[in-house]
Amino acid sequence: MKNLLTISLLLLSASLSVSAQLRPDALQSEYRPLFRPDTLSICFIGDVMLHQAQIDRARLSEGNWDFSPWFEYLEDRLRAADVAIANMEFTLPGAPYSGYPCFGAPDQYAQWVADCGVDIFLAANNHIFDKGTAGAMRTLEKYREMEAARGIRFTGLSGDGNEYSRTNPLIFTVNGFRIALVNFTYGTNASLKKEWPKVNRMSDKDEIRAAVERAERLGADLIIALPHWGEEFKLKHSKDQEKMADFLVGAGVDAIIGTHPHVVQDTTSISRSILHRGRVPRAPVVYSLGNSVSNMSAPNTQLELLVNLRIARDYGGFIKILPVELVWLWCSRPGGFRDNYTVIPVKDFIGKSKLWSGKFDYDNMVDTFKRVSGAQSGEK
């Protein structure tokens, strides 16, 4: 009997010990889901330009520049994204530097853009050959140096066949997502006879289709087209842009973010046919982001967009694009918000006219925003 009592007490003690180890709060603290959804945010800004007035404003002394105030209110948004992408509408040819019509910026300008949080440079635009073959090649050299030293990637321009294959499409992996970028331009202001350096061109649909197919073979989760296209200063996209967008979605592109018109154009989404390749049922299209920073003052050219493309993978492993976030920006010139170039989020500053040095710029921002943002979306 004593032995049975002893055994019973031992069993009870062991049971209490196990119960203590497996109490509900302990189980909760150790819980880990078998799968979790992944998310990725990619933000895009428009034309980063450098007119002569900007060069003069930023120059501190010979070889010394200060661009830092220009993105003071923007850089936190760039850094908050998992990946930030900008259209670099200038060359890095070395001194002397110049603005429109042949853009040649100091090397520090590209470094500053990267300092603000931009991770990928888009080089396919109409100004990339403004300084000829030598200017384009030196731009490539500087971008390669930044890639080696800082991990900054680039696409749209290549110096040889190997670089073309590596950057068209440009593929990167972040947060478990494999993303492919296909960047191309409608043309260039200068025509070159040499094969290299080569800019990706919109007219060569076979090469664009081949780039999309390479991206698919390489396992891209999402393919984004970044065309430099459209008519300058037009708020509505053209028929040619619409036809090209249809071609891109039919070829397998999942999202389209455009530049070049220097103004914000309408946004839409295109339904994908079941006969089309692709990973999402509807492809968002932003026809033009507008400028990012420039000295332009023509109607609508100071209003611009930052687009935040948010991508998610659900518990089943399926990719989806969340509603596109549009952040309206205003590029204030010297004498406006303050005595320098400043890119500001419009909604953060509406109702704060007392912060402005020049009231005309504030009124222009509010009027332009209300007029342009009113009817900028649609679906097909």
Please tell me what each predicted stretch does.
Residues 1-22:
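Bacterial Sec-dependent N-terminal signal peptides
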Residues 21-380:
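Acidic, metal/ion-coordinating pockets
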